[in-house]
């Protein structure tokens, strides 16, 4: 029998809340994530399974999967296949830092788009002088490619944090109360470590963190090191701290680069990672189980007798 596991922390909260990074746990090796679980409350889990060829397994049945809490059976009360899509928000720094690399940035974005699955909904925004749509959410790749040429330099400082906060707010509103037509948001942003145009208060940053966690957002970041400009200590480090924290919380990828030429090869790498994540996240099983009376969940495991499977078990369905 093969299994995968998650570690939990008990809490007095009445609902299951993912408050720390939840990592997909492989059947071969078991990296473990955490979540807050209230004793006696039903536990909701997401199980993603693929075969030896990496193709999603779409015919698992409830009787083939055993959920246990701290070694005791957790009775499955609901077992359903989900096919939630990925919705990708791409945010691009168009401040003076990228003036000399505008052609490279556009070429990198085109390569990025070409590497994405065509069924992923994409939106494209620039971040200076404020976050604004260059291409609104859609799947028309011809129009998206044409929109890349509309990214033009602006003399103002980029608003890296504001762009992420607004994207998180949109995702939260779109997902609010949705049982049908749910989705997994992914944010990809290109920024720089120079002066930041956003001036967020602590509560606004905390809201950004909270919304990304609660809505199973994955955040990926490319940060260009701007050696030719002096950092503004008051604002120039804010986007770095926020960016690092977001990628740590959501399991995303953070890359600091020194040369603009790296964009051409790096952005397609991100697209490939997003494509793989999309394939796994979009075909999962949402499982609800009831822990035994008196249980104070610390460890949740899933086991199956089905051979030749590789699986990921999470509390929110996010597989970066």
Q: What residue ranges belong to the model's regions?
A:
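Bacterial N-terminal signal peptides
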Residues: 17-31
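Eukaryote-biased intrinsically disordered, low-complexity acidic regions enriched in Ser/Thr/Pro
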Residues: 36-97, 106
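Extracytoplasmic/secreted cell-surface and envelope-processing proteins
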Residues: 98-100, 132-135, 195-203, 228-233, ...
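N-terminal secretory signal peptides that target proteins for export/translocation
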Residues: 1-14
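Exposed acidic/Ser/Thr-rich ligand/metal-binding surfaces
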Residues: 129-130, 137-220, 226, 241-244, ...
């Amino acid at each position: 029998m093969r299994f995968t596991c998650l570690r939990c922390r008990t809490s007095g909260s009445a609902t299951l809340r993912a408050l720390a990074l939840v990592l997909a746990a492989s059947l071969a090796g078991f990296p473990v994530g955490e979540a807050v679980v209230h004793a006696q409350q039903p536990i909701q889990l997401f199980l993603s399974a693929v075969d030896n060829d990496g193709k999603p397994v779409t015919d698992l049945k409830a009787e083939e999967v055993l959920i246990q809490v701290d070694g005791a059976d957790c009775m499955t009360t609901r077992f359903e296949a989900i096919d939630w899509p990925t919705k990708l928000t791409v945010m691009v720094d168009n401040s003076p830092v990228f003036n000399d690399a505008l052609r490279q940035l556009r070429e990198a974005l085109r390569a990025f788009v070409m590497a994405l699955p065509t069924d992923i909904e994409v939106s494209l925004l620039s971040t200076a002088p404020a976050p604004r749509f260059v291409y609104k959410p859609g799947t028309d790749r011809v129009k998206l490619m044409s929109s890349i040429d509309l990214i033009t330099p602006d003399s103002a400082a980029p608003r890296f944090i504001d762009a992420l906060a607004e994207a998180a707010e949109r995702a939260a509103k779109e997902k609010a109360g949705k049982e049908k037509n749910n989705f997994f948001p992914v944010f990809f942003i290109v920024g720089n470590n120079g002066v930041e145009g956003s001036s967020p208060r602590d509560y606004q940053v905390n809201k950004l963190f909270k919304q990304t966690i609660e809505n199973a957002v994955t955040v990926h970041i490319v940060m260009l090191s701007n050696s030719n400009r002096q950092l503004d200590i008051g604002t120039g480090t804010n986007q770095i701290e926020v960016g690092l924290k977001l990628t740590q919380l959501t399991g995303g990828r953070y890359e600091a680069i020194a040369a603009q030429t790296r964009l051409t090869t790096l952005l397609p790498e991100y697209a490939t990672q997003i494509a793989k994540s999309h394939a796994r996240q979009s075909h999962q099983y949402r499982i609800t189980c009831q822990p035994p009376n008196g249980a104070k969940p610390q460890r949740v495991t899933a086991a199956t007798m089905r051979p030749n499977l590789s699986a990921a078990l999470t509390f929110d369905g996010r597989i970066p």
